[in-house]
């Protein structure tokens, strides 16, 4: 399923997203995060030791809710982890997100030895207001 133009617009803007994955016991885990898109996938940059990535390795289902400035400007994407990207591309991507969200040339937090990973999220269903 391709991404709706509203999803692309919200993901390309400096809008925060809530990412929901499933813990091993089935409980949902929600985290607030930066989000991006390449036009085909939603992109979330994380660290490989984080719980959300562990959850996705076990169960690839994920929901991403992106909120705009207006409370009626949002998109919910229910989907699955389609692929991951690591290495220098993931490090460059977190720097890109730092510029987009906090106007910093590089990501302001230390990057651990595990590095960064981009989660490429494919949409299975998109819900929009209205």
Predicted regions and their residues:
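Extreme N-terminal tail/first-helix region
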Residues: 1-16
């Amino acid at each position: 399923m391709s991404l709706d133009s509203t999803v692309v617009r919200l993901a390309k803007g400096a809008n925060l997203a809530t990412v929901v994955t499933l813990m091993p016991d089935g409980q949902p885990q929600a985290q607030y995060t930066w989000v991006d898109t390449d036009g085909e996938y939603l992109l979330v940059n994380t660290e490989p030791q984080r719980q959300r990535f562990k959850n996705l390795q076990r169960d690839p289902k994920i929901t991403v809710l992106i909120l705009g400035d207006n409370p009626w400007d949002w998109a919910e994407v229910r989907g699955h982890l389609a692929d991951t990207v690591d290495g220098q591309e993931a490090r460059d991507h977190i720097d890109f997100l730092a510029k987009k969200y906090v106007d910093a040339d590089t990501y302001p937090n230390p990057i651990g030895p595990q590095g960064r990973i981009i989660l490429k999220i494919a949409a299975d269903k998109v819900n929009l207001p209205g």
